[in-house]
Amino acid sequence: MKKIILSLFTLFTLSDAGGCVLVQSGDMNVTWKAYKTLAKVGVAGAFTSIKYTPAAKEGANFRELLVGSTVSIDTMQINTNNSTRDETLVKMFFKQLKNTTIEGKIIAMKADKRVKRKPYTGVLDVELNFNDKTLTLPMKYRYENEHFVAEGMLDLFDFAAQDALTSINKSCYDLHKGKTWNDVSIGFATNIKATLCKVELKK
C-alpha cells in the first residue's frame, strides 16, 4: 500500500519534482480506426508486427525519449478481432498500396502549458512514409498513470491512396453501404515510468 501511495504522489508532483528519470518500456502498440457508411461507423484495428527503435530508453524528459524514435510497421499483419475482415483488408487495401510497410519517425515535440494534477499533454510531429509518400502529421499526446498515448488523423488522399480506397470500397460495398471514408484515425501507445524523483513533501 505504501508503494502505491508513493507512486501516485510521485505522478501528481512530477512537474514540481527535480531530477526525475523517465524510463521507456521499449514496447509500442500502433492502432487505427477506419470509417464506413454515411453514419461514419468506426472499425478499429491494430498492427501486430512492429519494429520500434526508441531514441533513448531513459532520459530527463519526453523529448529525450521520443524525438528521433522510429517505427517500421508490417501492414500484412493486422488484427481487427475478425479474421475474415483481416484477410479482406490485407488483400483489398494494404496489398493495393505501393509498398507493404509504413515507416514513422518522431521529429518534434511541443508540450502544452502544465496544469497541476492534470495529465501531461502536447503535440508530436511524426514524419510518416505511407504508400511511398512522406508527410509530417501532427499527433496530440497525453501522459497519465505511466501511459503515453498519441492520436492523429491520416487522410488517404494526401498519401495518394485513392486506388486502395476504391478497391476496399468496391469489395465491401454492401457492408459499407457504398461509403468508405478517406480519413483514418491513427494512434500509438507506450509505457513510460518516472523514477528517482526528488520529491519534497509539502504541508
For each predicted feature, which ranges?
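Sec-dependent N-terminal signal peptides
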Residues: 4-13
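Low-complexity, acidic/polar, glycine-enriched regions of mature
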Residues: 17-203
